[in-house]
Amino acid sequence: MSTLEGRGFTEEQEALVVKSWSAMKPNAGELGLKFFLKIFEIAPSAQKLFSFLKDSNVPLERNPKLKSHAMSVFLMTCESAVQLRKAGKVTVRESSLKKLGASHFKHGVADEHFEVTKFALLETIKEAVPETWSPEMKNAWGEAYDKLVAAIKLEMKPSS
């Protein structure tokens, strides 16, 4: 497990993240796809970062590889957020974190990409749980996302 601290993630933030994730989880596949479509809407050039989208004539919203990738990224991001306070750190398996870091490094993912992704994630969650969305919930998810990104960035180096 990564040892990046979950300090500063309060009980209230945890409750907001857990409550919203409980409401979203049954629709994780659909929400994951919406999340990625938002990323590509904001930054169309981001599509070039995904090898499985190159030379594909399948519309993004129907692309099975994108759907699968989007769901796994959305699930990993949300599950990481939910357990942050309890574990006291980002708990993505160490091997996964190393793989994520190496992959993001290899594809040239930069800070701007992480910012676009954060914005798209927060917008996706806001649309998924409009009745409970609040500035506090936005901050809680933003904080959890920032901790995950910091853990990934620590591993952003060539794979060995």
Swiss-Prot record:
Catalysed reaction per UniProt? Answer: Fe(III)-heme b-[protein] + nitric oxide + H2O = Fe(II)-heme b-[protein] + nitrite + 2 H(+)
Give the first-level EC class, as a single word: oxidoreductase
User: Which InterPro entries does this UniProt record tie to the protein?
Assistant: Globin (IPR000971), Globin-like_sf (IPR009050), Globin/Proto (IPR012292), Leghaemoglobin-like (IPR001032), Leghaemoglobin_Fe_BS (IPR019824)
Which keywords appear in this protein's UniProt record, sorted alphabetically?
Cytoplasm, Heme, Iron, Metal-binding, Nitrogen fixation, Nucleus, Oxidoreductase, Oxygen transport, Transport
Organism of provenance = Casuarina glauca (Swamp oak)
How is the subunit organization of this protein annotated in UniProt?
A: Homodimer.
Can you say where in the cell this protein is located? Cytoplasm; Nucleus
Q: Name one GO cellular component term.
A: nucleus
Identify this protein by name: Anaerobic nitrite reductase HBII
Q: What is its main location?
A: cytoplasm
The protein's job, in short, is:
Phytoglobin that reduces nitrite to nitric oxide (NO) under anoxic conditions (e.g. during flooding or in waterlogged soil) and upon root nodulation. Required for general plant development and during nodulation, especially for the onset of symbiosis. Monitors nitric oxide (NO) levels during early phase of the nitrogen-fixing symbiosis and buffers oxygen in functioning nodules. May not function as an oxygen storage or transport protein. Has an unusually high affinity for O(2) through a hexacoordinate heme iron because of a very low dissociation constant.
